[in-house]
């Protein structure tokens, strides 16, 4: 069963959109709290959430501020309303607390993808007792080949400008 709701962010009162998929049958195995990446939204994860729910996991995800439905206006996509990373971490904490309130007996698995992987690492650094398992995937990192890519891009740009 799919539930959608929202809560007012403790950081600044912004409405944060949340979705949960609940398995049809009990007992539930655990709760998976998903934390999405930059320029994503919670609906992108529905097929993955359905898969986990079929395996017996309760799955909860929220749209980060400035993403999906966690905006005041569609033109605001990408803007965090001044709250920045600290407000995003506070929103993750609010969702985490609500999960613990609804499912105190279940283990909580926190999973972050891409920008979400950076967020969950920062979250766990301060709130490790709130998580039973951490899954970090698609973490951004420095690519040693980046200077070569930048040089190629500059060369191609120069060639395009020269031939125009």
Which residue stretches match the model-derived regions?
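Active-site nucleophile loop of the alpha/beta-hydrolase fold
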Residues: 135-144
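Short glycine-enriched nucleophile-adjacent loop
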Residues: 117-128
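Alpha/beta-hydrolase fold nucleophile elbow
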Residues: 103-113
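N-terminal cap/lid segment of alpha/beta-hydrolase-fold proteins
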Residues: 1-23
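Conserved alpha/beta-hydrolase
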Residues: 53-73
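Alpha/beta-hydrolase active-site loop
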Residues: 81-100
